[in-house]
Regions:
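Positively charged n-region of N-terminal signal peptides that target proteins for export
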Residues: 1-4
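Bacterial N-terminal signal peptides
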Residues: 6-14
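N-terminal post-signal-peptidase region of extra-cytosolic proteins
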Residues: 48-65
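Sec/Tat signal peptide C-region and signal peptidase I cleavage site
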Residues: 15-19
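Sequence context surrounding c-type heme c attachment/ligation sites in exported
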Residues: 20-42, 65-169
Length: 169
């Protein structure tokens, strides 16, 4: 009996270590406008309510501390995303995982590519390398430093690129 109780205790203690890593699934990527949009920013935040609330607070105050919470998904465009995976994943990239996505009119999303420095954006640049170069001191979130205009995007172009096939018409 003591053995069973001991094994149960070990299993219970192991769960928090596993829970510190978030692995995004296609269902985690929804209509862009369903995400929370911080005041004065163009990106949208997704995740569990508690995560979104923390991420919004960090974004709105600009006090990132140790960075965004694990489980945060940030999207500027419906076809790209970054998710704070955490754990031991991508230490050199701040724990972020980058995605190329295909949003579908039926509301679903396909993950075309996921990873670290090997994932490229619509300009064929490494997402991670660009984010690290531009905003390493801001948990790799470029809008704190340069914003979309820093990579040559006008407000009109950003709005056009934010058109999302998953959103109800």
């Amino acid at each position: 009996m003591r053995l069973i109780v001991g094994l149960g205790l070990i299993a219970a203690l192991a769960v928090p270590a596993i829970a510190k890593e978030f692995v995004a699934q296609p269902k985690d990527f929804r209509c862009l406008t369903d995400g929370a949009q911080p005041e004065g920013k163009r990106f949208h935040i997704f995740g569990k309510k508690r995560i979104v609330k923390k991420a919004l607070r960090k974004t709105n105050t600009g006090r990132l501390g140790k960075g965004y919470p694990v489980g945060t998904i940030l999207q500027l465009f419906p076809f790209e995303a970054m998710a704070k995976r955490g754990g031991k994943f991508n230490k050199e990239g701040g724990g972020w995982e980058y995605f190329k996505l295909k949003p579908n009119a039926d509301g679903t999303t396909e993950i075309l590519k996921r990873g670290t420095a090997d994932v490229t954006n619509f300009r064929d640049d490494s997402c991670q390398e660009c984010h690290q170069r531009q905003a390493k001191d801001h948990d790799s979130v470029c809008e704190f430093v340069i914003g979309p205009e820093g990579i040559g995007l006008t407000d009109d172009l950003v709005r056009a690129l934010q058109t999302d096939a998953r959103c109800p018409q």
